Amino acid sequence: MLTGDNEKGNAIVSEAEKYLAVPYVWGGTTPNGFDCSGLVQYVCNSLGINVNRVAEDQFKNGTAVNKDELQPGDLVFFEQNGYIHHVGIYAGDGMMIHAPRTGDVVKYQSMETDYYRSQYAGARRVY
């Protein structure tokens, strides 16, 4: 799934791939179970990149990236009613790795669905 020549960003995606199929757990921050921001924080911390714990605060980390300039490893954020409620790790080709919701698992997901397109808030580069 990796695209581009972006060593640090690709390392973030490769690290996140280790946790595919881990169950979603509200408030989860370990490989026993992750919520969306717990996955992002765990992956980044394991690579020596410090990010905040919750998605709304993670949206303040790093530098802003335009959607048409996304690179693998960028953090992508989604909002509803002005509130950042979800974060994923951009994996390239319009896909992200994320922990979506209770009853689901860490997985690849297209960002091009109506749901994610309509709630896209922006992206941050933390590496």
What are these regions (language model features)?
Residues 2-7, 14-15, 49, 91-127:
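Aromatic- and glycine-rich peptidoglycan recognition patches
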Residues 10-16, 60, 87:
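Short, flexible segments with low predicted structural confidence
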Residues 39, 88, 123:
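Short hydrophobic/aromatic patches on the structural cores and recognition surfaces of FHA
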Residues 49-108:
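...with weaker cross-activation on analogous glycine-rich loops/strands in unrelated enzymes
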